[in-house]
């Protein structure tokens, strides 16, 4: 695994460990903020995966087209999963934001 990808996975794992409990506990405002931040972390990670660099070693050689296609499809699968999980966090955010006394918090949950 490339260093940038390892760091990306490590950062998301840390964010999910910290933000997951915040999205499920506390006041409606705290749950909305935790869910929104969790969604943001997942969606940003998906975006970075989908646009990540293709290793030079895959871009050369006789079967480079096939290798690049397999690599890109694997990253796209991971990105799709993160998008689904990010959208689920946004869906969980909406009721918490609506229950919050400040209406502006609903904007935290907008896709």
Task: Give the positions of each predicted feature.
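Acidic, polar-rich low-complexity tracts and alpha-helical solenoid repeat scaffolds
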Residues: 1-111
């Amino acid at each position: 695994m490339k260093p940038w990808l390892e760091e990306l996975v490590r950062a998301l794992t840390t964010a999910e460990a910290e933000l997951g409990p915040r999205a499920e506990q506390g006041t409606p405002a705290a749950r909305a903020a935790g869910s929104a931040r969790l969604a943001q972390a997942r969606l940003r990670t998906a975006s970075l995966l989908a646009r990540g660099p293709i290793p030079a070693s895959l871009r050369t050689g006789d079967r480079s087209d096939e290798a690049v296609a397999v690599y890109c499809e694997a990253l796209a699968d991971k990105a799709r999963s993160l998008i689904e999980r990010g959208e689920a966090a946004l869906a969980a955010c909406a009721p918490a934001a609506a229950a919050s006394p400040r209406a502006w918090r609903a904007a935290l949950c907008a896709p």
